[in-house]
Swiss-Prot record:
Gene: creD
Name of the protein: Probable HECT-type ubiquitin ligase-interacting protein creD
Segments of skewed composition (Basic and acidic residues): 477-492
Homology family: Belongs to the arrestin family.
GO cellular component: cytosol; plasma membrane
SMART domains found in the cross-reference section: Arrestin_C
Superkingdom classification of source: Eukaryota
Keywords, alphabetical: Ubl conjugation pathway
Amino acid sequence: MALSFFSGGGSASYAKYFDIRLDEGYIVFRGGEQEAASAQLSGKLLLCLSEPLAAKHVRLNLTGISRVCWHLPSGSASGSRKSWREKVFYEKTWTFRDAGKSKTEVLAAGNYEFPFHVILEGSMPESVEGLSDTYVTYRFKAEIGRKYAKDIVVRKPLRIIRTLESSALELSHAMSVENIWPNKIEYSISTPTKAVIFGTSLRVDFKLIPLLKGLKIGQIVSQLIESHDLTLNPEDPDSIRNTYKSTRTIVSDEYELDDEGSLEIIDEEAEGYQFSRYLDLPKTLTRCLQDTDTRGIKIRHKLKFRVQLLNPDGHISELRATLPVSIFISPNLAIDENNNLVDQTPQTARRAVDDIAQQAPPLYGEHQFDQLYSEVDPSGYRTPGPGSGPGTPFGALSRNISSENLASMNALTSTDLSVSALQTRLSNLHASRFSNPSPTEIDNHADSEQRRLGISTADYFGPSSGSNSHSPASPELSRRPSDEGYRDHDHIPSGMATPFHPQYAEVETLSRVPSYSTAMRSTVRPCDSELPDYQAVVAEDTAMPALQSPQQAYIRSAGRGTSMNTGIDVHQLRSGHFSSRTSNSHDEEDRRLRLVQARARV
């Protein structure tokens, strides 16, 4: 409320303009009181003086007040009995000028701007306005104190809106009630979402399938009911609270079906009625409040339905159902100081619904007061946890997931991972590339290791393998993933060299990747020193042997009545079963002669 001039005597006419101007028209909290982030309130106090003004102080005060009140009818002639309680729960004062006790300060003519700002906690109560004697309000009061004249005062309300987050379940979950009344009707009544924006419309979908021949649907009544639960002392225990409950009807809709035009096939099975009804919500808070529960004021909404069933024998039955709904205020629909929507056109309401459905993530500026990551306790967010075993085997390659190795898994927690063990594995892997042991050497080495570890070398399917290979008494079947366990962990069963608490600092050191400049300065080592480089291969004058198709010889026996085919396949020739691949010309002619003689005898 801006003052352009002041009536009365004295120097009151010197203040030509005095107003409170906010950077934002209202404060928005997204989420409940326990989860909403803080918000910044900022603005300016503007003062325009045409002549000097003597003032004791210039102050701005923000006050939050809650009031709960109700009237109970009384039998006396005085009328009703009133119960009420008012409390100031928030107060903030900015002092821009203060001359001191019993002193004044002369403000020269000109324009003055006094900026102010404050951080409002997300747990602060939201504004509740619309009831006559019950409310939660925030009001600014700017004051210029004067010594020998009336103080100059201007007031401005502040509205705090608590709305739903875009990820709230109320915005995505449909509410429905469906059931079957035996030998009467099958019904389903639903709403697309539980949450509804204040000032928009509420859609209700009906599906009614009569199960009794000759049953007709009568009048269908839909009502939006608002319940008030007021408490004078909400901080006290439930047993001693002074409460008052009341309800009122916000919207009522009556509808009758057209039996001939509305009947249709539903779900390709039964005939019934399927339709939708729209309930337009009021555009003012005096007729409909938002859902809230703060400062002893609890507001809730629900839909009530009554469906008349006209039975063939003439009597009337009634189907009753209820659905909970939640009404919230959208920041996209502005509300004026008289608690009415500023823009009440259907296009604006449709736009607000679409904005909620396609809401983008909040801007960066709306999260400048969120909790920092450094303030979050990281316990429980890092993996692996203290109780997680890092040595889980591959199911296709290990039998450690079966029951016979449960006992051996206990040894998993008794070892530790060291850098030397990793280096040993790498060196063994590198050394194995240069050595090609014969199969006999490998078998002898495996037999010696099995004898040292006490593992039987009998056939797995032989008699000595036991009747059941999955017996819990065979933990020795676990496999060792690497070779250093033979030397470093001789006392641990096979496969039990995986640590429980690895030394992550040493592992990170080994897995550190050098920078690009460091890699460019280092020399490139060949993967295998015995392999020739590219220049050596190009310099050699190698003659590629001519490729020949596979051959197979068939030799018949000397007898006419019997024959025997002896086939020699290419795989055997290439595997070294014959010492020579070619023969001289004499051997070739001799072989051809024998073939001709054999054919002549046949």
